[in-house]
């Protein structure tokens, strides 16, 4: 450990965003809006070097994400490399492009965990949100195949105003598939979700109803062995205090983008902060010594009202990316906090959710064509 910063612990979780390529077009994905101009991807050898450096520092878990990580032909090799180093390995996938042959290959490579995402509980809505008419049946087949290969079935449903009212059907589908773990995560408003926020943010009434449904199912499932873990994540737009984002800036989590930029969270590349590349620096140098990773560590950077707040060690001042997106200054208090001078922006978004009538086909979908239009415009 760098003796100049003895209080900084090493990262425990590495997210390898292998690619921005993806066969689905979810309008809520957290990838950057200008992903289409990010053409380069780290090679197999470069990724393995990243894994080696992260493991040497003490990281214990790695997530393979994207885009869709399945489009990388070297995925089995990357899994094997990470597993041989002692990582707990997790594949985060849409299931599109997954086959039983690939599941076999991943198992042989040592993959520990597979999470498959769904857009909805029925084929029509799933197709509308994914931009892929065949996605739903493929996801069903692969969820069953993952279970048949001895993996726990871990499902993720991203919730928003267009599908949250079918949360009971979503849970029923999870029970029908004999899922072990289900994450019902209301979309977090970064990247494409922030672009489409007006058309995605549920109303407070929708959130309350969904919470009641989840509570009823938890009571019903208690003791049955079904859905041992049913997690419901609500949007912080209906909270009065911000989330402790990533467990603190540069405290636990380290993400590497397809072209090798190292970030303290998924969305930080949008900030007016210079972040280093794994092609030019070691992870040790990046984690302990880089400007980007030290920018919002600890509490010294905080302005008021965060600096004197008794809750700062719990929420770390909230989300820097959200502060930047909403106020234009990442140093500001997260507007979710009722103590923030910008909290009115959150109140206005809640009110807007009660009035909007944006339909699914009016959302801006995450695809290369839309991305090119955005960054060229």
From Swiss-Prot:
Gene3D superfamilies: Aldolase class I. Pathway: Cofactor biosynthesis; pyrroloquinoline quinone biosynthesis. It is an enzyme of class 1 (oxidoreductase). It comes from Rahnella aquatilis. The lineage of its organism: Bacteria, Pseudomonadati, Pseudomonadota, Gammaproteobacteria, Enterobacterales. PANTHER family: PQQA PEPTIDE CYCLASE (PTHR11228:SF7), RADICAL SAM DOMAIN PROTEIN (PTHR11228). One of its GO terms (biological process) is pyrroloquinoline quinone biosynthetic process. It catalyses: [PQQ precursor protein] + S-adenosyl-L-methionine = E-Y cross-linked-[PQQ precursor protein] + 5'-deoxyadenosine + L-methionine + H(+). PROSITE patterns: RADICAL_SAM (PS51918). The keyword rRNA-binding does not apply. Residues 8-224 form the Radical SAM core domain. Belongs to the radical SAM superfamily. PqqE family. Interacts with PqqD. The interaction is necessary for activity of PqqE. Keywords: 4Fe-4S, Iron, Iron-sulfur, Metal-binding, Oxidoreductase, PQQ biosynthesis, S-adenosyl-L-methionine. The keyword Glycoprotein does not apply. It holds the Pfam family SPASM. [4Fe-4S] cluster binds at residues 22, 26. Binds 1 [4Fe-4S] cluster. The cluster is coordinated with 3 cysteines and an exchangeable S-adenosyl-L-methionine. Catalyzes the cross-linking of a glutamate residue and a tyrosine residue in the PqqA protein as part of the biosynthesis of pyrroloquinoline quinone (PQQ). This is PqqA peptide cyclase.
């Amino acid at each position: 450990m760098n003796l100049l910063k003895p209080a900084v612990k090493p990262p425990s979780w590495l997210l390898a965003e292998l690619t921005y390529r993806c066969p689905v077009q979810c309008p809520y994905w957290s990838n950057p809006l200008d992903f289409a101009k990010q053409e380069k991807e780290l090679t197999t050898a470069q990724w393995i070097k990243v894994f080696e450096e992260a493991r040497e520092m003490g990281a214990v878990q790695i997530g393979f994400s994207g885009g869709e990580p399945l489009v990388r032909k070297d995925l089995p090799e990357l899994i094997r490399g990470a597993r041989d180093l002692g990582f707990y390995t997790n594949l985060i996938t849409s299931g599109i492009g997954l086959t039983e042959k690939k599941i076999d290959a991943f198992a042989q490579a040592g993959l520990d965990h597979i999470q498959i995402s769904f857009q909805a509980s029925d084929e029509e809505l799933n197709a509308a949100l994914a931009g892929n008419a065949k996605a739903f049946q493929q996801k069903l087949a692969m969820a069953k195949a993952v279970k048949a290969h001895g993996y726990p079935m871990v499902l993720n449903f991203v919730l928003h105003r267009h599908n949250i009212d079918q949360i009971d059907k979503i849970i029923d589908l999870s029970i029908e598939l004999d899922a072990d773990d289900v994450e019902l995560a209301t979309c977090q408003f970064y990247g494409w979700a922030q672009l489409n926020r007006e058309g995605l943010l549920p109303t407070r009434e929708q959130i309350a109803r969904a919470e009641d449904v989840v509570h009823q199912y938890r009571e019903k499932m208690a003791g049955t062995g079904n859905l041992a873990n049913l997690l419901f994540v609500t949007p912080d737009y209906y909270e009065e205090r911000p989330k402790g984002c990533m467990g603190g800036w540069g405290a636990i989590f380290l993400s590497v983008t397809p072209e090798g930029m190292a970030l303290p969270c998924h969305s930080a590349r949008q900030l007016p902060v210079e972040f280093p590349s794994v092609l030019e620096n070691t992870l040790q140098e990046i984690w302990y010594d880089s400007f980007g990773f030290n920018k919002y560590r600890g509490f010294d950077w905080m302005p008021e009202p965060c600096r004197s707040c008794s809750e700062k060690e719990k929420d770390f001042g909230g989300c820097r990316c959200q502060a930047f997106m909403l106020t234009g200054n990442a140093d500001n208090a997260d507007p979710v906090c009722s103590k923030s001078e910008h909290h009115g922006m959150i109140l206005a978004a809640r009110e807007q959710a009660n009035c909007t009538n944006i339909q699914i086909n009016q959302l801006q979908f995450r695809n290369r064509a839309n991305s090119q239009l955005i960054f060229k415009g």
